[in-house]
Amino acid sequence: MVGASPLLRMERVNKWFGDLHVLKDVGLSVDAGEVVVVLGPSGSGKSTLCRTINRLEPIDSGTILLDSRPLPSEGRELARLRSDVGMVFQQFNLFAHKSVLENVTLGPVRVRGLSRRDAETRARELLARVGVEDQASKLPAQLSGGQQQRVAIARALAMEPKLILFDEPTSALDPEMVQEVLDVMTGLAREGMTMLVVTHEMGFARSAANRVVFMDHGQILEQAPPEDFFASPTTGRAKDFLSKVIRH
């Protein structure tokens, strides 16, 4: 809708770790249904940016708005925020002592108030959607890394979030397992899920992103549609980065 506010807006966001200034006056907006991929070298602030959006990392100054409302700092409102903003981590972060099905149903039952029966029905649908429906009774350790990450995506989807954050979701996977996770993410993008994805997967950025954001040293240096960013980056730093990560 023309004139609608972005789902996510970050304005002049700063974050320090001691003397290290990791986010420097960051401004970013994400519209509902948009897929934004954040690229940049290691240590550029990409993961910290991701983690500030659901307050896993509090910011030192600036504003972050979700649905035009500032992020709450604590209590029930923070729990509500985290149910609206899903997150998929590099290391999966599944509950090791709970089955795959329990991992996916826990949040909807405890936070959303679903009945266990409804939550399990929904969980099985989501596990089928990501291709691991036959793993429902297993513990995470019995699954491959790619399967665990697909369960983590199903767990995020089970909360029916407005936005899902992906923090380098394939970087801990063996190379042959990367594509199965990217295929699930590409499917979500095509279905209209709002996604902010920190990744080194250039193919995903090219094919699935509406916009590429390039970061270095805690700053957003450029933003562009992927076809423009990969064909003609405007900053020397982005050109240098692409020359190193893309093999011709």
Language model: regions and residue ranges:
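ABC family nucleotide-binding domain
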Residues: 5-226
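C-terminal boundary and immediately downstream tail of ABC-type ATPase nucleotide-binding domains
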Residues: 223, 227-248
